[in-house]
């Protein structure tokens, strides 16, 4: 018969008591009262934070936006088709954040930083909050380095600096996205990381942009964040903040970044949809009262870091679509007042064959020549004034029957200057090539040519200089100044090429 020993039993009980780990889990839960149109009303969740992520029973994630006395309004990050009335919801205790790493370069992701290009998962050890505060005044320094777009009209007259926010605005189909993609293509070899955020665009348009970037080898330094027109409003609202978070990650690692938002007016529409469904009071054009803050907190994150923070930069290029040229609508005026200047694209110029269709008269950069190299300042200083005078004269000349010789010469010069600003899509020019082009036009070397010959001559001149006078490019890139020596080389090349060109044309 087995004898029961009391000390053995007490030892076992003691051992079990020592091993017992008392864990108390406190969950903040609630119940779904109502769900539909991407919005859920939750009863409970008493201690939820504004902007906190909540998880539904079937796995959908939402963001608590409306904290009311008797319920919580949650926007869903998904279709929410499986959520049922009466099902439970728990607060996660986390604010929306995404993983960040170098591995995102060359990838196409959605607003939750999940890859959508079918090339597998992205490994990341760090994460950042989607909504993070913009750098303060002490953390910034004034913009002083240029961000070359490769477009003569912009780099010479509406220069963009690293850390600036420049709005690209115009009607639909005026080449706004083309300006942005050319800017990305021109950053090749410039050590600038680009982020392109497509908000509410057609999937085919986004695919076209990605294909262009891949063909030109620009995806190596680019991240594409895409939420197409069929995405839930919540994800379209979040996409720009996801892009900004990725750009910020590189900025704080002392790198230069450029971010394109295409376009914030679609984000505002998604936010309006969410706000109206949450029963927030509508304001002008039915947008909620805080739609200005929606864009200001996004665009204020673009900055040029101080030397203490490593002088990284984040340049923002928001693209806003206008309706039949109405720049005074609500969203365009909001974004104009937040940014440091705007590039206005005109449908009339576009249809007249002037592409990029930049209306130089009403476009402006509030950073100005601080964002240009000295050589560009020296050469392009009087270009904007000459074009403005030409536009005025051209309007006047329509009504005048006989014009004096000086006016005719000025009109002829203006037409040739306008011609040299034309560029093909996806063909950005290096700053040295732009200097060659502008100098040739402003100093009257094109006056003897027919308007139809101008572009052909300039292409051949740039090629001739590259092959026969490589010292010119070396002087500009090393000194950043248009020296006497560089000018002499350029004059010599123009004369030599002009003789060759005129002989060719006669044959």
Swiss-Prot record:
NCBIfam families: atpA, PRK13343.1. This is ATP synthase subunit alpha, chloroplastic. F-type ATPases have 2 components, CF(1) - the catalytic core - and CF(0) - the membrane proton channel. CF(1) has five subunits: alpha(3), beta(3), gamma(1), delta(1), epsilon(1). CF(0) has four main subunits: a, b, b' and c. It comes from Morus indica (Mulberry). GO terms for molecular function: ADP binding; ATP binding; proton-transporting ATP synthase activity, rotational mechanism. Keywords: ATP synthesis, ATP-binding, CF(1), Chloroplast, Hydrogen ion transport, Ion transport, Membrane, Nucleotide-binding, Plastid, Thylakoid, Translocase, Transport. It is found in: Plastid, Chloroplast thylakoid membrane. Belongs to the ATPase alpha/beta chains family. InterPro entries: ATP_synth_asu-like_sf, ATP_synth_asu_C, ATP_synth_asu_C_sf, ATP_synth_F1_a_nt-bd_dom, ATP_synth_F1_asu, ATPase_a/bsu_AS, ATPase_F1/V1/A1_a/bsu_N, ATPase_F1/V1/A1_a/bsu_N_sf. ATP binds at residues 170-177. The record marks 363 as: Required for activity.
